[in-house]
C-alpha cells in the first residue's frame, strides 16, 4: 500500500444532505536538481532539554551536518537564556569545518538556562546570510532557519511578527512531550516553512531528512484539489482543510472536506509548477475508489479537523465551540461531565 492514495466518505447527519470526506494523497513529483542551502541551525539548550531531548538533538545534528556539501553555507547557534554562536557567522560547509563541528556535538549539553526564544530568533535573523535568495539574482540576508526546541515560551506575538518580516523560512522540530505546538506551527506556516514533532526517544533523523528535502526544493509546487460533488450546482465545498504550502515526493497529505452533495468520484490532487509565469500540471494523485462509512465517524473527524484549524489560527472561536457542541466533541472549547450513579 506504500505510495497509494485513499478516500473514505460518509453522510453528515448534522448537515443538510452533506457528505463528509477524508482523503489521503501521496503524489509523485518530478525529480529536480536540489538547490544549495543557506541554513541557520538554532538549537534549544535550555535546562528543559536535558536528558532524552538532548540525546535526540545530538543524533539529529550529526546527521544533519553530514548531509551538507561544500556548496552549502550554514551557521549553528545554541540558545537558552543566553546565546552561543558556535559559528560566529554564516560559513561554507567545507569538509574540514564539518569534521571539526561534528567533534563538538557530543559535548553539547542543556546548560544555557531558560528558553529566551525571541532573543535567539532575532540574533539569528540579523546574522548575515551573505548570498542570493532562491530564484533571485539579488543579494540578500535571508536564509532557511531550522529550530529544534522542546520548551514553551512567552512573548509569542512579537516572535511571530519578527519572523514574518525577517525574509527567512522557518522550519521547526518540536521534541519532548510538551513542545510549544501552536507557536512552532505558526512560525512555520507564516514564513513558508514546515513543522514536525517527534516524541521522546523517537529517532529525529527522518524528520531532519524531510526538512532538508523541502529546503533544497528548487521550485515551488502549487496544489489544487477537485472534490467531485455529484450535482453541478454544488461544485464548491462547504468547508475543506487547508492545503499544505509544500510537499515532497512520496509524502502523504491528509485532507478533510464537507461537500454540499454526495460524491461518486474520488477527489483528485493536482500538482502544478510555474514555468515562465505559466502554470503547468506536473503530477496528480487520486484514490482508486471511495470507502463509505454510515456510522457518522467521518463527519465527526471532519468537524474535529475544522475545529483544529480554527483554534490554530485563533479564528472564529464561537464557530469552533458551536461545532464541538453540534458534533459532541471534547475540545478546549467544551467540557465533558461524567456522572457515575452508585447503587443504593
Identify the meaning behind each predicted range.
Residues 1-42, 64, 202, 221-344:
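An acidic, Ser/Thr-enriched
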Residues 162, 178-218, 222, 327, ...:
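Von Willebrand factor A/integrin I-like adhesion domains
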Residues 11, 15, 33-50, 59-62, ...:
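Short, charged loop segments at secondary-structure junctions
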Residues 72:
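Glycine-centered, small-residue-biased loops immediately flanking beta-strands
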Residues 84-88, 182, 207, 343:
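Short Asp/Glu-rich motifs
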Residues 50-55, 314:
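Ordered, soluble secondary-structure elements with a strong preference for glycine-centered loop motifs
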Residues 75, 173-175, 198-201, 208, ...:
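A generic structural motif
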